[in-house]
A protein has these predicted regions:
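CBM-like carbohydrate-recognition segments
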Residues: 25-75, 79-122, 130-133, 167-170, ...
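Asp-box/WD-like beta-propeller blade repeats and closely related beta-sheet repeat scaffolds
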Residues: 139-169
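Long alpha-helical scaffolds in large eukaryotic adaptor/regulatory proteins
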Residues: 76, 83, 127, 134, ...
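An active-site-proximal structural segment forming one wall of the substrate-binding cleft
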Residues: 99-102, 136-151, 194-208, 264
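Membrane-interfacial loop- and helix-cap regions that link adjacent transmembrane helices
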Residues: 222-226, 232, 259, 278-291
Length: 446
């Protein structure tokens, strides 16, 4: 969020909380300890916004933006895994457990009435990541029950309930996120059912206006009102990132299939072309909203998520490593220079400016943390890649988790109007939540 109007007071509070920190992040990109220090600084700042570990508060809860909790916990998981710092692991464990809900499907009753498929998915990805990184299943099962064939020959709607603006849209983050989840479950469990679903979602996406395997354009959404004949082609980095990440997992699952290597390369190159523009020195930019300074909190998180997915892609598909790491490094150096706000390492949004730009918030700190941690792959290598159930993972799949969920909304509704879309705003950010539930959420009991 941009500071000058609504966040000045918040900025003052954050200043008081960690004003003793250094006024700048002096990042030496080739130095492992320097990267650790940078990540530690931004993680500390990020956690000043988290109150779920305080008396009377709900662990893992962000009442006005529930899905963003999954982004914070994903950042904490990666931070712990790549740096070895366990400072926040208790908050991480308790928060993930608390928000999983009574069915282990990340649809807690406090929020289930307004969740989107993408919201739930992001929490699932957090749980999946916990399993893959050996930290300590119901989302997948609930989501595939919502595979909708009433229009467009399949696909996931953006929203779950008919009264939600967005119910008649099918979008890339919901479908690409479920694809990613299925691919990761296939690799982790080696169970064919997940690979079958990954291929099904991928092929449907290719048959729709969302994903083009000739140009590798990824559109944001398509409308059921015209049977998905047209697209909303607003460009967001996380739409590319989620399909790329899923393709990388399928590449690993299939032991190097040429089909999936082509997909990874195509999506990665298009991502670089669109969001790492040479006019900005090849620094990561959310091009739809940053130039106009109109990014909302969701959109501020996209670059952090994609930075993480790029780092995992580099580990899963080794031929991409030498292309991905320089992009991450260049962006990290610039981002560190943006973390000079308010004399307390407050990070900005427009990293390409290489100076603080006046933005302040939890989301800015999460994205910077994700980027710094992503650069740790240079020093940790393949030894820190995601494990499977047979290579060190201790989570077990629960094929019936989430079966009690009844949120398969099939009530006919009228098409969404242009005004409805404007009110809905940008598609809700994160695609990763849904996967964790299906893993039986073994992080709960070890």
């Amino acid at each position: 969020m941009y500071l000058p109007v609504g966040r000045i007071v918040a900025g003052g509070l954050i200043f008081l909380l960690f004003a003793s920190r250094a006024a700048a992040i002096d990042l030496i990109i080739d130095d492992e300890q320097s990267l650790r220090d940078a990540a530690s600084t931004t993680t500390f700042a990020m956690m000043t916004y988290y109150h779920g570990n305080e008396t009377g508060q709900i662990p893992g809860a962000f009442p006005s933006k529930w899905w963003e909790g999954s982004a914070l916990f994903l950042a904490l998981l990666h931070y712990w895994h790549f740096t070895g710092d366990t400072t926040y692991n208790n908050e991480l464990r308790v928060g993930l457990e608390w928000q999983s809900g009574k069915n282990g499907d990340y649809m807690p009753s406090n929020y289930s009435s307004y969740l989107g498929n993408d919201d739930q998915m992001f929490w699932g990805l957090a749980a999946m990541t916990a399993a893959e990184l050996k930290f300590g299943d119901g989302v997948f099962n609930t989501q595939i029950k919502r595979w909708d064939t009433t229009a467009c020959n399949g696909g996931m709607r953006w929203q779950i309930w008919p009264y939600q603006s967005g119910y008649t849209l099918k979008n890339s983050i919901s479908n690409g996120g479920l694809f990613q989840l299925a691919a990761r479950l296939a690799r982790y469990t080696n169970e064919p059912i997940y690979a079958t679903w990954a291929n099904k979602i991928w092929n449907w996406s290719l048959s729709s206006p969302l994903l083009n395997s000739s140009t590798w354009n990824v559109a944001d959404s398509t409308n059921m009102g015209d049977n998905c004949a047209t697209q909303g082609n607003t460009q967001w980095s996380y739409n590319y990132g989620t399909y790329m990440m899923g393709a990388a997992y399928m590449y690993s699952y299939t032991n190097g299939s040429a089909q999936w290597l082509t997909a990874v390369d195509g999506l990665m190159n298009k991502l670089f072309e669109e969001f790492f523009p040479s006019s900005n020195g090849g620094i990561f930019e959310e091009v739809t909203c940053e130039p106009s300074e109109q990014c909302n909190n969701n959109e501020v998180l996209f670059k952090g998520l994609v930075s993480t997915w790029l780092s995992f892609t580099a580990l899963l598909v080794p031929s991409t490593y030498d292309k991905i790491l320089p992009k991450l490094q260049t962006s990290a150096v610039a981002a560190a220079k943006s973390c000079t706000g308010h004399n307390n390492n407050t990070c900005g949004v427009r990293w390409y400016q290489s100076q603080y730009d006046g933005w302040i918030g939890m989301e800015e700190q999460i994205s910077a943390t994700d980027l710094f941690v992503a650069n740790m792959i240079r020093f940790t290598g393949n030894s820190t890649g995601p494990v499977t159930a047979t290579t060190g993972g201790n989570s077990t799949s629960n094929p019936t988790a989430g079966e009690n969920d009844t949120s398969t909304a099939s009530i006919p509704v009228s098409a969404i109007t242009t005004g409805d879309r404007a009110g809905a705003g940008i598609l809700t950010v994160l695609f990763t939540a849904g996967w964790f539930g299906l893993m039986g959420f073994t992080v709960l009991g070890g």
